[in-house]
UniProtKB/Swiss-Prot annotation:
Keyword ATP-binding: no
Protein name: Superoxide dismutase [Cu-Zn]
InterPro entries: SOD-like_Cu/Zn_dom_sf, SOD_Cu/Zn_/chaperone, SOD_Cu/Zn_BS, SOD_Cu_Zn_dom
Residues that, per the record, bind Cu cation: 47, 49, 64, 121
Binding site for substrate: 144
Lineage, uppermost ranks: Eukaryota, Fungi, Dikarya, Ascomycota, Pezizomycotina
PANTHER family reported for this sequence: SUPEROXIDE DISMUTASE CU-ZN -RELATED (PTHR10003)
Amino acid sequence: MVKAVAVLRGDSKISGTVTFEQADANAPTTVSWNITGHDANAERAFHVHQFGDNTNGCTSAGPHFNPFGKEHGAPEDENRHVGDLGNFKTDAEGNAVGSKQDKLIKLIGAESVLGRTLVIHAGTDDLGRSEHPESKKTGNAGARPACGVIGIAA
């Protein structure tokens, strides 16, 4: 079992953690989140981005992690970036707790997300389904108010 965590920080009141657990190289990864301080009663995007570089805030993380050269999509789509995690829902206080399993997110192997950045976005991911020019690249998910590098956890 490999475990990892991203501790979220940024230029906003958003904070929290996103954890990852993978039993072996062929197993799906469980992604769990506990996020506070976002917009109330909203769907907000989160993605794994290419770089673990946060020297200029979350913008330094680069584009979505996309080792297979696919278009942006929903987590359940065949054609999607590895880093496309979709949206999480916040409650009336702007907090979100949840988990999902993902077959493309890996902690083991050449396409591992370890050392990359988990980014929380200001907007909702359109899952690559709109006519907006950013839809097939970013899901038109907006600014990056919080992020954290994915590191190995105890």
